[in-house]
Amino acid sequence: MTVSTAIARLNAADPDFARHLDHLLSWESVSDDAVNQRVLDIIKAVRERGDAALVEFTQRFDGVDAKSIDDLILDRARLELALTRITPVQREALEKAANRVRIYHERQKQDSWQYTEADGTVLGQKVTPLDRAGLYVPGGKASYPSSVLMNAIPAKVAGVTEVVMVVPTPRGEVNELVLAAACIAGVDRVFTVGGAQAVAALAYGTESVPQVDKIVGPGNIYVATAKRHVFGQVGIDMIAGPSEILVVCDGQTDPDWIAMDLFSQAEHDEDAQAILVSPDAAFLDRVAASIDKLMPTMERADIIEKSINGRGALIQVRDMQQAMDVANRIAPEHLELSVADPQAWLPHIRHAGAIFMGRHTSEALGDYCAGPNHVLPTSGTARFSSPLGVYDFQKRSSIIFCSEQGASELGHTASVLARGESLTAHARSAEYRILTQEKGN
């Protein structure tokens, strides 16, 4: 049995290709006035009423019979219990994935440094981890334990003192895999709250929920809107759009493999985007046939079909160099280089969240256990953004120590520049430190 999908076909030789591509890529999630106002009301309530507001919203939105905030707190012992409630195979997979993620992120750690100039002046940079990070995890059956690993482990590697996780438990439904992942990743505290109210609690603190320095993790439109509103009070990772995959293929990979790689992102939601670029028109036809053949075998076929038909595309290009140009124009979240010699083409890629090299490297491996982070820039923001990493949980302070001679010498320069800006106090502050014998020079 096969189905007939209506995936878009584009050709880079078409005079209107750029316009068609822009239309394909266009996606904007704008919170409407009602969502914005509701989120602002929730934030205000949490700031004013703290724990009581959290309990009330959790009862209302999640259907949880919580009498007090104590009913919404999971201690470390509960996380350890979750490890015993998952299968040995699941635990082994989580621990292996966590170990690989940890090893990779250890290489990202930045260290402080200093250097000393001839006159004894010392300049440098001090790298310090954040004190506390907040991790938002979606709840219910759609929970992703892999996201817990990807968000929490870099924070712990960075040296963050405390990682606080919030995860809703709709109708009391607890995902043991998520709690087990939190235990393995080193999460310190868990609160079973979600939505905008959880974001507000992390940003401003309540009697029980500690205020954090940065909030990371995905969520629905209410969570994303709340993160926008609290940014500045705390740091945030990003406002993520729908998941994306762009596959560049020379036409020599099994078309079933490519179709399934496209499905792997399309199954996330109807707005996800899956695009294949190839110079081989016949190969595009074979992949289209594989899509139709494999679609009925998918558990989430309805979602995949809507995604493929609504935002997917098969794009024919002149050659592999033009394929690179198209890839850089799209700046995808996930980029597969399913080609014979991916290393040869890697220097041509400037904009991508993660690059999967070669025919055997499916994007799914990066999602779960390869090691690099799966929290990636979407919606073209890979042009200026990077994957989540240890550096997102570290901050840098400049170090300046001037010797007497150094302060005297730099004082002349600072004085000239400060007076040029009519900032007399700046100038005089520097001038006071000029050595007496140099003041007349």
Swiss-Prot record:
GO cellular component: cytosol
InterPro entries tied to this protein: Ald_DH/histidinol_DH (IPR016161), Histidinol_DH_CS (IPR001692), Histidinol_DH_monofunct (IPR022695), Hstdl_DH (IPR012131)
Cofactor note: Binds 1 zinc ion per subunit.
Recorded GO MF terms: histidinol dehydrogenase activity; NAD binding; zinc ion binding
Residues holding Zn(2+): 265, 268, 367, 426
UniProt xrefs under CDD domains: Histidinol_dh
Top EC category: oxidoreductase
Cofactor annotation: Zn(2+)
Alphabetical list of Pfam families matching this protein: Histidinol_dh
Gene3D superfamilies, alphabetized: 1.20.5.1300, Nitrogenase molybdenum iron protein domain
Keywords attached to this entry: Amino-acid biosynthesis, Histidine biosynthesis, Metal-binding, NAD, Oxidoreductase, Zinc
Catalytic reaction list: L-histidinol + 2 NAD(+) + H2O = L-histidine + 2 NADH + 3 H(+)
EC number: 1.1.1.23
Positions of the catalytic residues: 333 (proton acceptor), 334 (proton acceptor)
Binding site for NAD(+): 136, 197, 220
Gene Ontology biological-process entries: L-histidine biosynthetic process
Family: Belongs to the histidinol dehydrogenase family.
Role this protein plays: Catalyzes the sequential NAD-dependent oxidations of L-histidinol to L-histidinaldehyde and then to L-histidine.
UniProt protein name: Histidinol dehydrogenase
Species annotation: Pseudomonas putida (strain ATCC 47054 / DSM 6125 / CFBP 8728 / NCIMB 11950 / KT2440)
Lineage: Bacteria, Pseudomonadati, Pseudomonadota, Gammaproteobacteria, Pseudomonadales
Gene name per UniProt: hisD
